[in-house]
C-alpha cells in the first residue's frame, strides 16, 4: 500500500472515532463499512480523549487542524532544519484555519543520555542501526520471513553515511545530560507544546530503562510548569 492509499484510509477512519464515542454509529465508506456500533466503555472525557495525528506534509497538517485535532511531527533521521520546517508547516496551517483554536504540536525524535563519550557513541550506534533497518523496511526490497527482515550486513550499515552514528549524534537528541536539556529547550523555543521520545532502537531493554529513568529524574524537572 503506497502512502497516498494509506492516507486516504486514515482520513476516512479517524473521524469515525469521535462518532463511535458518541455511540450508535454506522459507517458505509469507500474503505470501511460497519453496522451501528458504540465504543464501550465510553471515554471519561465529555468529547472523548484528545486525538493526535502524525503529520509531515501540509495535507496531513490540514486534515488534523481542520478537525481541531493535535499534530505530532517527527524529523525522522534529520535534524534541526527539518524540525524547524515541520513547525513552520504547523504554524502556517494554523494561520490558514484560525477558527480551529484547540491545536497542540508535539515533536518526536530519538533521545539518549550518556555519561561519557563511550556511552554516547553506544546510543548513537544503536539509533544508527535502527534507522538502517527502518530505511530497509521502507525500500521494500529485502526478503521478509516470519515478520522479520532479512538482516543487514555490517558492511551495508557502515556504507550508509546518512544513518551513521556521527549523523545520529548530530541530528538526534543524543548527548550529555546538558546537551539533551539544551535540545529540548530548543524545541520548546520553536513553539512545540509537547516533546515525545522515540525510544525504539537497538539498545537493550535495561539500557532503555536506565535512560528513561535519567530523563524523568534529571530532564523533566527542568520543564515542569
Question: What residue spans do the PLM features occupy?
Answer:
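Alpha-helix-loop-beta-strand connector modules within alpha/beta enzyme cores
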Residues: 9, 212-225
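Hydrophobic faces of well-ordered beta-strands that scaffold small-molecule active sites
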Residues: 51-54, 69-74, 103-110, 195-197
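Glycine-rich tight-turn/loop motif centered on a GG-T
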Residues: 1-4, 209
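An alpha-helical appendage that flanks or caps ligand/catalytic pockets
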Residues: 4-39, 81-192
